[in-house]
Amino acid sequence: CIRDRDKLFGSYGVYAADPFHESAPPIDTPEYLTGVGQTIHKLFQTFDAGALWVMQAWSMREDIVKAVPKESLLILDLNGSKTAANGGWGYPVIAGNLHNFGGRINMHGDLALLASNQYQKAKARYPNVCGSGLFMEAIEQNPVYYELAFEMPNHADSIPLQAWLAAYAERRYGAKSAAAGKAWMYLLEGPYRRGTNGTERSSIVAARPALNVKKSGPNAGLGIPYEPMLVIRAQSQLLKDADKLAFSKPYRFDIVDVQRQMMTNLGQLVHKKAAEAFASKDKAAFALHSGRFLELLRDMDELLYTRSEYSFDRWLMEARSWGETKEEKDLMERDATSLVTIWGADGDPRIFDYSWREWAGLINGYYLPRWQKFYTMLQGHLDAGTDYQEEGLSLAYGREDFRANDFYNRLAEWELAYVDQTGKARTPVTHGDELVVTRRLFDKYLKLSREYYADFSGVGEIKEERTYENVGEE
């Protein structure tokens, strides 16, 4: 295998290997693990005398690491947690941030932590820290986070964050706007507040339906870890200077993103009201709140349809472009669909929705029908005067299992059929004007927000103990 690589690419000095990544070794003894480290090191050195082994710290083991000379190993500490725990045992370490899992779409990220200059702090504590890195699983979300993170290694100390954000807004939008600067202060107090690094919160939109929705993906759960009106105030400020800033493509991206966050946050409370109405057997209230929730999903799809960055249709068309024959193109579409839905090839996946995305096309074609089927099922129970019980169902990573009961089994068959369906992409991949659609939906959901947030009490201390989660260890 390594010789075949040499024929294709030649030797290039740097080689990656992560033994037992997110898994357990067959023999977990110091002697065995030391042997693993020595064997891999010898393989690399035999192939390339100057080889540098690059290893992720995610699942690294001390005995494997210490079997390799320090000059022959570079550790990538994806989220900085291992460096904080053991200093990398004196080995060269790149200490970084793992800000996004699976390409999930959610505004978050501890900007104050970045502005404090993590690299310089880590370097001062551990001289073996030799670099800073970003190890996100996907991009095209939270551009402010990445802009600041990539800038910080150029600074010798911390920076004044509020001043940086004001300059960022002007630089990003290409014009001075006090309102835009104020908007970013609200966002700093809200989704970019302290403690919001690591795993993004779940999405009610992308969650597999349940009365008590716990998670969308297999990691962090639902919840809004800040006062949700802060996002609404930010959007109000961004729209104030729309006539001045509408020429700016980054501005148009941001107003869509903030509107998306405003609506997905609100969706958590709307569905909660629908679930409460079902529990109390209030048919009128159930119809009102479930109807509003489904309408919110349709509106989100329309909103996100205005930007190619939020286009499932673009994703599918680009995937199909890699195929030469119809069979290859269909396979590429199936795999691209599977990645953002069931996350696997079998009929009973456990890490389904790992890579959920709030995307146009995926909402309209996948998430919305799931919720429609669920609410229709609940309505049937209301009409028949029967109960629907979720308590005691088998769970997979804190959510109802893929086939936890009859409803989920039927839903699973529909989901698997959706993955196999071809020709799903809509053309063109975008439709509508971002500013026109955003303004209309802001006015519409501002009114509903005032109603649903009237008694909101969901903001509390952010719990950090599950900030980073390894889905390989349940």
Sequence positions of predicted segments:
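Polar/charged low-complexity regulatory segments
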Residues: 223-245
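Short, small-residue-biased leader/transition segments that mark boundaries at the very start
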Residues: 1-2, 298, 305-460
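N-proximal short alpha-helices
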Residues: 105, 141, 239-247
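Short, solvent-exposed, charged loop/turn and helix-capping segments
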Residues: 241-255, 303-318
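Long, low-complexity, intrinsically disordered segments
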Residues: 464-474
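Catalytic-core regions of glycoside hydrolase
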Residues: 3-201, 205-226, 232, 279-294, ...
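Ordered core of a single globular domain
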Residues: 248, 252-301, 396, 400-403
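Feature representing long, continuous alpha-helical segments
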Residues: 166, 185, 232-236, 261, ...
